[in-house]
Curated annotation (Swiss-Prot):
Alphabetical list of Pfam families matching this protein: Herpes_UL24
Inducing or repressing factors: Expressed late in the infection cycle.
Protein name as it appears in the record: Protein UL24 homolog
Repeat in keyword set: no
First-listed, main subcellular location of the protein, grouped into a coarse class: virion
Keyword Nucleotide-binding: no
Stored InterPro entries: Herpes_UL24
Superkingdom, natural source: Viruses
Role summary: May participate in nuclear egress of viral particles. Plays a role in the dispersal of several host nucleolar proteins including NCL/nucleolin and NPM1. Since deletion of host NCL/nucleolin negatively impact on nuclear egress, UL24 supposedly acts on this process through its effect on host nucleoli. Induces cell cycle arrest in host cells at the G2/M phase following by apoptosis. The mechanism involves the inhibition of host mitotic complex cyclin-B/CDK1.
Stretch list, region Disordered: 193-257
A single GO BP: symbiont-mediated arrest of host cell cycle during G2/M transition
A Gene Ontology cellular-component term: host cell Golgi apparatus
Family designation: Belongs to the herpesviridae UL24 family.
Length: 257
């Protein structure tokens, strides 16, 4: 795949319609939410990689939209507890196609841009991470996702060898947390509540007690808001003379128009 120049990349990507860019942003957020759903590293790796034969071992932590110098890494994954702790820097690109076509100008421009972003991000971490006694490696990942299905259509780990850095897990976590986009993390933390369902899959309403309270309150508001509701001002029965029963009314009183 021929790598275009930086000027060609900017020119090609600037021609994308605004609607395509908005769709790409939505796909990024949807991908972040999917990543947060996976509790195990093998499941997360199957979602990310197009060739998930050898997933890393250990436990992981996720960071999104991390500012690293003049670049913003889409996602950083720290994997520790295994044989070798690894810091994965992930650059996401989205597309409408189900495969990466080498001759497509937009795809080649996206790839070239992603490789430059990864190179700068890794260089920043290697030279700016707080020093420590643990030997970590920084590994870049370039991933293309389909905007609609979020399936990985292409993945690449550029570079012949991972970049080493000596730090500690605690220091690296603090380093990335301080540079993570707090607004994105807040949006991702807001998970919509699912409605309660019964065994047949139907949405359950409020409990009988709550329905009764709501019904009484609602009925009281309606009565106050109706000026035509008849208000009793006299006794139910009245006699002209003692011992003489009142005559029955010709019909029921009107309770309203």
């Amino acid at each position: 795949m021929v790598r275009p120049t930086e000027a060609e990349v900017k020119k090609s990507l600037s021609r994308l319609p605004a609607a395509r860019k908005r769709a790409g942003n939505r796909a990024h957020l949807a991908t972040y939410r999917r990543l947060l759903k996976y509790s195990t590293l093998p499941d997360l790796w199957r979602f990310l990689s197009s060739r998930p034969q050898n997933p890393p071992l250990g436990h992981h932590r996720l960071f999104f939209e991390v500012t690293l110098g003049h670049r913003i890494a889409d996602c950083v994954i720290l994997v520790s507890g295994g044989h070798q702790p690894v810091c994965y820097v992930v650059e996401l690109k989205t597309c409408l196609s189900h495969q990466l076509i080498p001759t497509n100008t937009v795809r080649t421009s996206q790839r070239a841009q992603g490789l430059c972003q990864l190179s700068d991000s890794i260089h920043y971490i290697a030279h700016s991470a707080p020093p420590g006694t643990e030997a970590w490696t920084i590994t870049p990942l370039l991933i293309f996702k389909n905007q609609k299905t979020l399936k990985t259509v292409y993945s690449e780990s550029p570079g012949a060898f991972p970049t080493p850095v000596h730090t500690t897990e605690g220091k690296l976590c603090a380093f990335l947390t301080a540079r993570e986009n707090a607004d994105i993390r807040k949006v991702l933390s807001k998970v919509p509540k699912k409605p309660k369902m019964d065994r047949g899959g139907k949405i359950l309403g409020p409990t009988p007690g709550k329905r009764a309270v709501y019904s009484q309150a609602h009925h009281g508001r309606n009565k106050k808001g109706r000026p035509w509701t008849a208000q009793p001002t006299r006794a139910k029965s009245r006699t002209k003379d003692k011992g003489t029963p009142a005559f029955p009314r010709a019909g029921p009183a009107c309770s309203g128009p």
